[in-house]
């Protein structure tokens, strides 16, 4: 069945029909979904979703474009006091969330971001939080704080290694720095996925040689996706996973509309044409790959 290795069902784009959509995914051939954390404010709801849906798993992490909103660089997020019965959270996450809201300094050697780190660690103690992500570097915007992003990337790689969890990496306009940090921080010891891969086939080979998987989504179906099609042809099938990044990056013919996990089939069909396989073979192989990464399949 389809394994969507990177989705954002906590996004407000799904507020109107989230329950109906998620409840119908199995009928549309979707067996597993990993809901990707992007910021502190997303983590509570992601955890709630993992408890509500058997097939849905989650991650804990801070997106590079959210890194400046953490630690000393942010106001506190709006979070009401929670009780374990109300939200169904494990006690570690409950305690971390409430301490985070109160702004409590948890350790004597506190530094900017320690509360966020404690929350990530608490999330990883939950049985269905399977990875650290989405983390990485994004230099697309002019006001990018590269040092802050690098600091958070390094911290979160360290947490992943500590917990023996895979990472999934967001990298945009930061090819060299991302690979350099992956090597310097020994991220290959954690392993994981290079999400929404957008670089050359030569760069893909560097990651595959380190043991990483290449995440491919709806962009593969676009007419102007020549470079990604070259990557897809070059990377061995046993190092490719499928993803949506929904609600973003819907495949053709749905480009510009809201994406969801059932639409992965369109990406699988294009990848199948490139690889000389059937769409069902692509779905099966990429499911097996994702199972190896996240360790969730029964």
Please give the residue ranges for each predicted region.
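Mid-domain alpha/beta scaffold segments of enzyme catalytic cores
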Residues: 1-298
């Amino acid at each position: 069945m389809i394994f969507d290795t990177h989705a954002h069902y906590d996004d407000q784009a799904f507020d109107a029909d989230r329950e109906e959509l998620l409840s119908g995914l199995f009928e549309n051939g979707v067996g597993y979904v990993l809901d990707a954390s992007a910021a502190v404010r997303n983590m509570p709801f992601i955890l709630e979703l993992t408890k509500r849906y058997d097939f849905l798993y989650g991650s804990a992490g801070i997106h590079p474009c959210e890194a400046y909103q953490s630690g000393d660089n942010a106001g506190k997020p709006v979070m009401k006091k929670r009780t374990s019965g109300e939200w169904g959270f494990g006690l570690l996450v409950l305690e971390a969330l409430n301490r985070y809201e109160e702004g409590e300094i948890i350790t004597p050697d506190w530094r900017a971001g320690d509360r966020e780190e404690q929350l990530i660690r608490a999330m990883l103690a939950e049985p269905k939080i399977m990875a650290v992500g989405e983390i990485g570097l994004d230099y697309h915007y002019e006001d990018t704080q590269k040092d802050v992003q690098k600091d958070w990337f390094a911290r979160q790689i360290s947490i992943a290694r500590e917990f023996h969890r895979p990472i999934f990496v967001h990298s945009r306009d930061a090819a060299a720095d991302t690979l350099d940090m992956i090597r310097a921080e020994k991220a290959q010891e954690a392993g994981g996925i290079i999400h929404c891969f957008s670089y050359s086939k030569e760069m893909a080979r560097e990651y595959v040689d380190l043991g990483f998987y290449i995440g491919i989504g709806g962009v593969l179906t676009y007419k102007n996706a020549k470079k990604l099609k070259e990557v897809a042809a070059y990377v061995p099938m046993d190092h490719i996973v499928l993803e949506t990044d929904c609600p973003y990056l819907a495949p053709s013919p749905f480009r510009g509309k809201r994406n969801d996990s059932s639409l992965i089939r369109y990406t699988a069909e294009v990848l199948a044409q490139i690889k000389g396989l059937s769409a069902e073979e692509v779905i099966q192989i990429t499911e097996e790959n994702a199972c190896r990464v996240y360790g969730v399949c029964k």
